[in-house]
Amino acid sequence: MSEPLLTTLDSIRRRSGTPAPGPIIREISPDGSQVRIVYSACSDTALPAIIRREVSRAFDMGADFEWKLYGHDRPPRLHTALLQAGLIAEDRETVLALDLRQLPETVESAMKVTSPAVRASVAQLADYAQISLQSGRSGVDAERSRLATTMTDDPDSLQVHIVYVDGSPVSAGRLLLDRPSAAAELAGGRTVPAHRRRGHFTTTVLSRIAAAIEAGAETLWVDALPTSALVLTKLGFTPVTWTQPYVADSAIESE
């Protein structure tokens, strides 16, 4: 693991939400439907009570709950405490970073010859939702509503890039911008099954790299499953650590 990049990552995590006793950093979606713990520095003995408190708080809000664990988080038994609290571990992803100040020549060349994806308007989020549905995603309407709220209230923090083929939306991804930290993040990449393995995902990545540079970002981050990580490493992204979401099942509320 790269210590400078880990330090930068933790700084971004601490900025991404609201501090709460623990200490933890709590991130709440604009519509209040999702609560996520994105950073923690709790003592071993305090962990169980803090986890119970945060899960109960989320359920009291009627929100989904997630604790986002990273490979370098402490204490080492944090993952065990999350499981013992009844949270469910989802797929582990690799955290990768790209230095936008020193792009690989292959990426610069590809950006020159690749037509950029379309930066979506709020109205075009309907096309993003269409891609999501055709990709088998759930909660599409709620996601579209959250994205529309963010794009309306804080347009400098979020972009959605869409690739169209013959007028139909086939691939897309989000770009999250945190201008004070000069960091940006790729998220929400998805492609309609019939159009996969045709370079459309790469097009959305290149388009978002260009947009991140234009916005003044210096480092671009992404959490990637193995298939996406393979494409991203070929574009110069470097593995930094791993991350894994732990989500609360509604049964916890009654315990």
What is the predicted function of each stretch?
Residues M1-G17, T94-M111, S135, D153, ...:
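Terminal substrate-recognition subdomain of acyl/acetyltransferases
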Residues L47-A123, V222, S228, Q244-A248:
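Acyl-donor-binding surface of acyltransferase catalytic domains
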